[in-house]
Amino acid sequence: MRDFLLGSSVATAYIVIAIALAVLVQRLCRISSEALRKTLHFILLGSYIPLTVAFSVWWHAAIFASVLIALVFPFLLILNRVPLLSGLLVERWRGEYFGSMMMALFAMLITVCVCWGYCGDRYLVLASVYAWGIGDGVAALVGRRYGNHKILWRFADAHKSVEGSLCMLACSFLSVFTLLIIRGGISMPAGILISLLTGAATTLGEMCARNGLDTLVCPTVAMGVLLPLVRLFGG
């Protein structure tokens, strides 16, 4: 119980402090809603580090993620009813933040249970999520600014661009490869191949996912490709 409370305190402190700082910066510097959206995106990604470091066993992290899922609905109800808070973010479609947050937390729970609980490897939790998260955040910014060549494929989201998807692929590859090197147990050539295949699958998932579903789809796709390949190459 002591370990669980300590881990929960660390993870909660990170989330509260990071969000408070983001809101403070938004109020003081008047950054755009889109910039704040991406800031919160990276704050959520950062929460996986205390989640995988502060807890000593996987089921403590899974319980923490489950508690977050139980709390997020009333929190978002309050968010929508407090003028100071509801004015911080502009939804691109009705229920965007509720849906995105719920999917992000379910992705957190799934990756913790499968990668850490079943496979016994907390590093693969980070690799599965960061295969999507970092690239998605950067690719969105690149795509909006430089995405002049839209992907003309019937299964792809009409808003996706070649430039954004290439950026997604590069960031996904680098994220997975870096974490595999830190983790160890995989040769350099195998790490490159695993990272490239995981990045390609995640980029394809992000390209086809619509209405924010990439938040759940992409980490799951990355995990589905990454875990068998790591096992195959003796990791």
Regions found by a protein language model. Give the residues of each.
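Interhelical loop and helix-boundary elements at the membrane-water interface
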Residues: 1-6, 21-62, 75-176, 181-188, ...
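Hydrophobic alpha-helical membrane-embedded segments
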Residues: 67-77
